[in-house]
Each structure stands twice: as C-alpha cells, then as structure tokens.
C-alpha cells in the first residue's frame, strides 16, 4: 500500500453534531439542525449560554477536506473497472468497497487492489471464511 502524499495536519474544528434548539425539551422537535429564524430567538442572536450554530468558521481546510485519517481521499468501488481507475493515484486516493458487492467478488477486488498497490479502507469487511 502506498503512503499518502504529505499534507497539512487534519483538524476537525467541531466533531459534535449540531442539535436543533429545544430538541432536548420537546419530543416532537427532532434533533436535525434547523436554522433559527424567529425575531426574538436567543440562538439566532448568539446569546451567551445557548447552543452554537454551524457557521463557515467550523469548515475544514480546503486541502484536507474529505480526507480520511490516513491522508487518502476515499473512492467507492463496485467492480474491477472502478478499481483500475485508481492505479495512477495510489498516494492520494484509497478504495472503499461498496456494500452491495458480494463476498466472492470482494475477494477478487482485494487481490487486484493488492497487486495494483491500492489501499482499501474496508479490507476486512464481509470476507468469506472459505475463500
């Protein structure tokens, strides 16, 4: 497997999920984030002691956005043709085998990935014991 290209340190500025205001108070209010639009809303007016809203400042560095912790960008792979598109980019991209690939085809994909030197993120997932 090829090591990733050098890159700036991956920083996640906010790992907690942004929850909707009053989702803890009322069961009918789901946790999915909704922007507060009321004229008197303390969350919208950013009063001290209230939940924080998602803002552009929480965004990731453009160079490290969508990177996995290994430093590769993950590409979903369903067949050998998809896998072979990554041969020239083994340092910057890693393959992730799709959920709907059978365990029989998964074994062939893993063997081909090893031959090409492509990193597979979910290599241990759903492998047949006999194969």
Curated annotation (Swiss-Prot):
Keywords: Ribonucleoprotein, Ribosomal protein. CDD domains: Ribosomal_L32_L32e. PROSITE patterns: RIBOSOMAL_L32E. The keyword Ribonucleoprotein applies. It comes from the Eukaryota. One of its GO terms (cellular component) is fungal biofilm matrix. GO terms for molecular function: structural constituent of ribosome. One of its GO terms (biological process) is translation. InterPro entries: Ribosomal_eL32, Ribosomal_eL32_CS, Ribosomal_eL32_sf. The keyword Ribonucleoprotein applies. Pfam families: Ribosomal_L32e. Belongs to the eukaryotic ribosomal protein eL32 family. PANTHER family: 60S RIBOSOMAL PROTEIN L32 AND DNA-DIRECTED RNA POLYMERASE II, SUBUNIT N (PTHR23413), RIBOSOMAL PROTEIN L32 (PTHR23413:SF1). This is Large ribosomal subunit protein eL32. The gene is RPL32.
């Amino acid at each position: 497997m090829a090591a990733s290209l050098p890159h700036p340190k991956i920083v996640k500025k906010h790992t907690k999920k942004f929850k909707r205001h009053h989702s803890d108070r009322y069961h009918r209010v789901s946790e999915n984030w909704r922007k507060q639009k009321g004229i008197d809303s303390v969350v919208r007016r950013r009063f001290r002691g209230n939940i924080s809203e998602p803002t552009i400042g929480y965004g990731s560095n453009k160079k490290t956005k969508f990177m996995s912790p290994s430093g590769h960008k993950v590409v979903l792979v369903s067949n050998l043709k998809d896998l072979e598109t990554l041969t020239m980019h083994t340092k910057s991209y890693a393959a992730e085998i799709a959920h709907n690939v059978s365990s029989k085809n998964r074994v062939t994909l893993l063997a081909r990935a090893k031959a090409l030197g492509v990193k597979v993120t979910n290599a241990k997932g759903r492998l047949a014991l006999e194969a």
